[in-house]
Amino acid sequence: MKKILFMVFCIPLVINAQFNEYNPNYQWLTIKGKHVFVHFHPEAERTARVIAKIADEVWGPITSLYQYEPEPVHFVIKDIDDYSNGATYFFDNKIEIWASALDFDLRGSHNWLRNVISHEFTHMVQIQAGMKMARTIPAFYFQFLNYEEKRRPDILYGFPNVIVTYPIPTVNIPAWFAEGTAQYMRKEFNYDNWDTHRDMILRCYALDNKLLTWNQMGVFGKTSLGNESVYNAGFALTRYISQKYGENKLREITHKLGNTFNFTIDAAFKEVLGKDGNQIYNEWKSFLISDYKKRIHDVELNKIEGEIIENEGFGNFYPIFYKNNEIIYVSNKGNDYLSLSSIYLLNIKTKKSRKLVNLVNSTVSIIPNTNKIVYAKLGDDNPKWANIHDIYIYDISKDEEKRITFGMRANNPSVSNDGKKIVFIYQKDGTTNLGMVDIDGTNFKRLTLFENGEQVFNPKFSPDNSYVIFDYSYSNSREISKIDTSGANYSVIIKNGHDNRNPAFTKDGNFVYSSDITGIFNIYKYDMKNKVSIQLTNVIGGAFMPTVDDSNNLVYAGYTSDGFKLFYLSNEQQRLVDTAKKYVWTNNPPLGGDKPNGDLSRFDMNSLINYNDYNIPKYKEEKYSGFFSKLSFFPFIRYDNYVTSNTFVDRIKPGLYVSSTDYLNKYSIFAGGSINKKFERDLFLEFNYRDKLPILSSFSIYPELTLELYSVSRKTNTQLTFDPLDPTKNTNTDVTYNLFEVDLSAKNKIFTEGNYIETRFIFSQYSATIGSFIFPKTSILYPTTNDTYLIGSDIQVKFNHNGIVPTVDSDINPIGRQFEIKYDYEFNRYNKDNTYEIVDGILKPVYQHYNFHKVELNWKEYLQLRKGNTLNFTFRAAAILGPPVPDFFDFYLGGLVGMKSYPFYSVSGNKLGWLNISYRFPLWKNIDTRVGHLYVDKIYFSVYGDFGNAWTGEFPTFKDFKKGLGAEIRIKMNSFYLFPTSFFFDAAYAFDKFSRTILNEKVTYGKEWSFYGGILFDFNF
């Protein structure tokens, strides 16, 4: 019963999900601005103070555009991991900011805090302005539960075979519009603008006719490039609407999306712009293609890009020449996300490559005259389990890796030409600096002394190792700078107001670099003596990260409509560039003119545009005191068809979920309850505690504690038989079955991310309340009695491993491995035979003690045969150790969560073994169809076979094992743009027919079909 409820109870967590990570190693403080609270740990103090300043400054202009002002917003600032992002929890009035500045190859250079604070706060304002109800009601739910046929006389009803839960949210803003308006923020800020990276992405898509469709723009769930393309296209279309129809239309569209029965942006467009979504999209698309073709015309007449030498993957970066016509580089090929990139070695002539090191996203450098490379990668092997960068050396010939720094947050290393030093960047409190160590990782030396959010990138040693050249950025441009290896004599080499990056020295002491000075990133060579640059490429997309060999042949990362590829350009081809044949850059794209909202005159825009974040106001610090978000309420209506004899009204069970969390995720509470006309109840409460515990914290053990309470009741009318031979002496009465359970668990990460160990204590009590009745043919009233037939306790230890590879299909068709190992020690008092004794005139149950050990293994292996096709194995083995115990404690084999060929309660025993083999493949991907508020993305189909049994006592022969065959269809969708929707349907056939005698009744199973289905948020149940 609890398992059924748990599957349904957890549904609202999806719509209100957070990064449920709280690191108790840190002290937390709070400062208060005019409109905001900022919570931070001392290591992020500067970042927190700047954020308080920025948030108060941008509050007025952003709220003015949407004519909506939220309640005070809580910012949570983290500088724990080497991770850069912002996240807005618009139902909780909370924004999380990671202090590390974003360095993303698909984005240009901007001031991180000015950009991310304005971006996330715009999310808060715009999305709340577009809500249909108060933010405390995120969604309503409709739920449907159907159950297997009840056959066994000892159960009230079967296990669920259909589970449907579907939200009707109070917000339905498409992804492109949410992200487009957030990037737009207020255009005059110029904190985020239509930079050359954004133009590059959109230009390549438009010229190759690969723009995201109107439907695709509405949802995420794509690759790294695909998701960024939603941001990119959304920003472009938002600017188009603002410039053509007026900035005020952004507000009007937002407000129309908040109308009660408006669930698509097409309807909002029609009301505000007089055209539906497809009309606006086609109008914008036609303009883009025509405009880009005109502006790129001269470049196409003199295109100098070389040949593609690595076409696989959409993220190929940081190439360096190795030896014998070989290139070492970083690539995400074979993966859907840039975070899964690895180091490869490529032969330029044969175009064949091999992987050297897994999971590396940094630059790579070669130790001269060796077979060793130096790089950085993320890891959590440190006292605080923080996910940070450190430097490693890999010996290609020996296939050996060695870590040389520990906890430095060192990234993007480069080795000196004498092989003795390594220069790298490191991050602290939102500022990056250059550091240097010896080749073995010792003798750290700080080279730059930035303290105010400045960013440095891509350091390289000069040929004589006397200085380091690198990128520098503070706002909307990048400079190429240098500093002596002593830490003295900082100077700027190239500063022109554009984005200049990725310098790499040539043999003659000059350097090549990438610059967007023409509006398109191209490779240039800078003459150190004459201080002039020569253009080496003339591309349509973009050219980055150049490297040259001794003959001045060039390899670079070039952007195309399919992502970043590696290009090879010979020395001879580099001389063919005609600098007059260049791109026509538009300063205020797309249309060149604005139709502003006209509300900014009352704000000090000069101070917002020409900001000075070096001077930060003083704020009073206070110890964080546990701010909780407002309660969120999720009303629901459940149709619960567990007893077919119930009337329609009895099956309707209204209810409510409630949740709240403190802003640091130290504590959270989640509760729910439902009740029907018969007063059958489903109640639960979950409280999570993530703060440090005495003693354990001194050993760097920080478990998450959870308290769970369950109270469930079900009612039935049963016949009491006093004389089997005389029906007139029998009577009926109501019986209420009650389950009460308390769980206390402690969960802790072990070894590394994806591995958890959980210890749990479970106390459960099962009882039956028998209603009063009159003994037949008498006037004697038997009073209502309560029979507690089980008092159980369980100590459980569970280890979970999740090794699922992140892919765009990891929900519908996972790849990788999951397993769970579980041990229980149960000590129960159980009235097996319904035996009672009279104590003080009252019937008391006579309990028998059942104390036993229990072990269980659940293993899932998902093997990719070819792209999209997987062969999957599920293995489950379980046993109650020692002598047999009553079937009340049995394992169950079948049903929706097991061997689907047989009903859940059909096969049970003290021991269990089951093997499932399935083959899953796509029937239809990239469907890209929208029906109203529903977006249909992909359909997968699988066939599977089952072999398993459950037994008590001696191991049965294999011929007694049950066999089955089935098929499943899965459809992945999105509802209301933002909410994942997963439909599944199974049909399974049981080959083996068998009977069981239970309470003197013969029950037969097998040689029949079983059907299952559901609509949930994912397929992980």
Give the predicted meaning of each segment.
Residues 327-328, 373, 422, 468, ...:
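Hydrophobic beta-strand positions that form the internal "hydrophobic ladder"
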Residues 19-22, 27-30, 225-229, 253-357, ...:
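Beta/coil-rich, acidic/histidine-enriched accessory regions frequently appended to metallopeptidases
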Residues 23-24, 92, 112-116, 130-244, ...:
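Acidic/His/Gly-enriched intrinsically disordered linker/tail segments
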Residues 653-662, 668-716, 726, 731, ...:
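C-terminal transmembrane beta-barrel domains of outer membrane proteins
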Residues 17-167, 174:
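Juxtacatalytic substrate-recognition/specificity segment
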